[in-house]
């Protein structure tokens, strides 16, 4: 398994951040790491919803929401032969108007180990960019 994580403090309440984070279909509007998101069932974030995500330098991937605590966190997973990817998005309140965002990404499976090594730097850069982009989007609303 190859795993990556980043955290950032955002000067906004959890609910304000969640409104942007949970609007997956519009991520391409605020982060350069997402080119497009195709909603495969309903646009609102809920368990078992599926999204096709296109990212620069990467193959398109279909993601399924597998864990959800509204206004707090969600996990989605993408599976292909030999590889299983898991991404977590976690919000933790740190004060009256500050929230910590933590993003994690893990590659599992025999192919996931190899892909994780090859794309490790890209993955790390992408989750850091996503965290910084979300912070900028929310704080500049």
Model regions: which residues?
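Hydrophobic-ligand binding "helix-grip"
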Residues: 54-100, 106-111, 136, 140
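A conserved amphipathic terminal alpha-helix motif
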Residues: 106-141
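Hydrophobic ligand-binding cavity/cleft-lining segments
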Residues: 1-42
């Amino acid at each position: 398994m190859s795993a990556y994580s980043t955290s950032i403090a955002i000067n906004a309440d959890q609910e304000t951040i969640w409104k942007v984070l949970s609007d997956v279909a519009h991520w391409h509007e605020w982060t350069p790491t997402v080119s497009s998101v195709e909603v495969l069932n309903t646009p609102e974030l809920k368990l078992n919803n599926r999204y096709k995500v296109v990212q620069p330098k990467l193959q398109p991937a279909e993601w399924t929401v597998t864990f959800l605590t509204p206004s707090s966190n969600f996990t989605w997973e993408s599976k292909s032969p030999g590889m299983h990817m898991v991404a977590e998005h976690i919000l933790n309140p740190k004060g009256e108007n500050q929230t910590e965002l933590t993003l994690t990404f893990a590659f599992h499976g025999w192919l996931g180990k190899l892909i994780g090594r090859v794309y490790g730097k890209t993955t790390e850069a992408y989750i850091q960019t996503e965290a910084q982009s979300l912070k900028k989007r929310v704080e500049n609303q």
